[in-house]
Amino acid sequence: MEDLNVVDSINGAGSWLVANQALLLSYAVNIVAALAIIIVGLIIARMISNAVNRLMISRKIDATVADFLSALVRYGIIAFTLIAALGRVGVQTASVIAVLGAAGLAVGLALQGSLSNLAAGVLLVMFRPFRAGEYVDLGGVAGTVLSVQIFSTTMRTADGKIIVIPNGKIIAGNIINFSREPVRRNEFIIGVAYDSDIDQVKQILTNIIQSEDRILKDREMTVRLNELGASSINFVVRVWSNSGDLQNVYWDVLERIKREFDAAGISFPYPQMDVNFKRVKEDKAA
């Protein structure tokens, strides 16, 4: 009896296979196609990821940033590949995409600060407003850039402090790069007493800047009376020099101005104010 049941089961299974042969063949083809999609997608993801990494390294982009962005490209391609494979075997990909979208939204809301810094880091890498080794002012913080990472930028101030600034704050503020241009301009505002001889002051200032070798003579040099101030007449001196010489030129020229003016008897007045008193006579009693 049991032998008959086994035979009947085998016959039933055979009949079902024959009846559903087309359906099984279709499923088999879809599964093989899905596997092929996954294999090809993984190969393409690796090739494109490596190409992106090499491209960014060739453009001297930080290795950490290059690795992160290339990995982001790779996993993005893999995600699309898996969705395509699921669709090939009959899974409703619309619901999968909806779930992934909801999960991504939740993660984005939870990490919006970090994602903002990430997006800002990508923009800094793409547009390169500053590079490691350059002296910059980032939102009021000045120093030498040590590294530009995905989420933050590290810099050293002139007094030796190490400061880490989130990239989101950098993008939202002003970026001043002091190192990008090879030459820069110094400006001096020199105030002298009102009884000083204007021509003598201009001649001394002109001689000082003409004799300074680090000042670029092929650039415009300005020595002009700029303002009649409350306590002094103010001259403006504008000169150009190489960026590396800028600060030393400023200090040395300022010292020479003081020495030359002292030798010529030209004084630098202190802020002063004239106060006039007016006597008011009291009315006599009637």
Curated annotation (Swiss-Prot):
Q: Which InterPro entries match?
A: LSM_dom_sf, MS_channel_1st, MS_channel_C, MSC_TM_helix, MscS_archaea/bacteria_type, MscS_beta-dom_sf, MscS_channel_2nd, MscS_channel_C_sf
Periplasmic topological domain ranges are: 1-30, 89-90
Q: Does the keyword Membrane apply?
A: yes
One GO BP annotation here?
protein homooligomerization
Keyword Cell division annotated: no
Alphabetized UniProt keyword annotations: Cell inner membrane, Cell membrane, Ion channel, Ion transport, Membrane, Transmembrane, Transmembrane helix, Transport
Write down any Gene Ontology CC term.
plasma membrane
Location(s) in or outside the cell: Cell inner membrane
**A Pfam family matched in the record:** MS_channel_2nd
Residue ranges spanning the membrane: these are 31-52, 68-88, 91-111
Cite a single GO MF annotation. Answer: identical protein binding
Cytoplasmic-side segments: 53-67, 112-286
Q: Which SUPFAM superfamilies match?
A: Mechanosensitive channel protein MscS (YggB), C-terminal domain (SSF82689), Mechanosensitive channel protein MscS (YggB), transmembrane region (SSF82861), Sm-like ribonucleoproteins (SSF50182)
How does this chain sit within the bilayer?
Multi-pass membrane protein
Q: Where mainly found?
A: membrane
What effect is documented for mutating V40 to D/K?
Answer: Normal growth stops, without cell death, due to increased membrane permeability to potassium ions and protons (permeability tested only for D substitutions)
What does the record say about domains?
The channel pore is formed by TM3 and the loop between TM2 and TM3. After a sharp turn at Gly-113, an alpha-helix (residues 114-127) is oriented nearly parallel to the plane of the putative lipid bilayer. On the intracellular side of the channel, the permeation pathway of MscS does not connect directly to the cytoplasm but instead opens to a large chamber that is connected to the cytoplasm. This chamber resembles a molecular filter that could serve to prescreen large molecules before they are allowed passage to the transmembrane pore.
Q: Which family does it belong to?
A: Belongs to the MscS (TC 1.A.23) family.
Q: What is this protein called?
A: Small-conductance mechanosensitive channel
Q: What species is this protein from?
A: Escherichia coli (strain K12)
